[in-house]
């Protein structure tokens, strides 16, 4: 097993890569931040938002926001609404959502966001957790998969082009 020379992340982390010097892709991405033209990225984002507004279909929602209950996804939903979009908030329930996370999700609902929550069968989740632990070394692997796939499935099902 390899470990990153900077942060010690192990090579068992899914999708992690290492350069020839033994530095992981996450650290390389972080180190590249000063080279990002943030104004250009903001302009590109606003152009996407404008295009979504122009292409508005009969669909009620303009975009899907994967919501975890944390501050980042809450901010994203609020910011998108501020920019004039109507997001559909989607959660793939985890078995360890904190009380604060639950409160943040309730807060979004109280503010009028449409919200869909997917919860897996507890018996199936238990089996998948075991498989994740034994085969990948990550008991939360099934949650990672659902967090990344459920919002995409919802977007496809409802014909929403922006996630």
Region roles according to the model:
Residues 3-163:
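ATP-dependent adenylation/nucleotidyltransferase module used to activate substrates
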